[in-house]
């Protein structure tokens, strides 16, 4: 899980979602693409 100021999709399987007011990226193909804005 990377904590970044600016979250971006790394691959086409990455999805940008908002959970409890926090912007996150989840990825089905590569778990290393997970990010959180903070």
From Swiss-Prot:
Keywords: Ribonucleoprotein, Ribosomal protein. One of its GO terms (cellular component) is cytoplasm. GO terms for molecular function: structural constituent of ribosome. SUPFAM superfamilies: Ribosomal protein L36 (SSF57840). It holds the Pfam family Ribosomal_L36. InterPro entries: Ribosomal_bL36, Ribosomal_bL36_sp. One of its GO terms (biological process) is translation. It comes from the Bacteria. The keyword Ribonucleoprotein applies. Belongs to the bacterial ribosomal protein bL36 family. NCBIfam families: rpmJ_bact (TIGR01022). This is Large ribosomal subunit protein bL36. It comes from Ralstonia nicotianae (strain ATCC BAA-1114 / GMI1000) (Ralstonia solanacearum). The lineage of its organism: Bacteria, Pseudomonadati, Pseudomonadota, Betaproteobacteria, Burkholderiales.
